């Protein structure tokens, strides 16, 4: 954790060739895999999802950034830094927050200690049918979801009578 101007910031890294502009001013939840040491001393792994917004990457108001609508480059390490709360980062323990949130979601983790985690932020805005005639479907990651759906549909509907080669690729 780091901080600036009375805010606790989450240290993140951009994965892959990300389009960075859409991450600004979105309600972001956090999810992924958490590795814990159980009360009995067993190393365990579980999936975690905050299920609610816990972070935001704020953009500057237009009067503080007059060039915001002109061509600009975004520095991921400087500009894409999610805020998670007000306060002193020295007083906030992310692993403790994870342990408390996991325990709230599932009591079996009550005395477990978080050892490590691999988490990602995601936009919690729900998909929608949009347009005055409801002709559009809007959603984050729609390109990936549609290509997976089309590929899976092709696999399911493949005709056994004729030989064909289908390839499934996962980018997770």
Regions found by a protein language model. Give the residues of each.
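N-terminal hydrophobic/helix-forming segments and targeting peptides
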Residues: 1-171
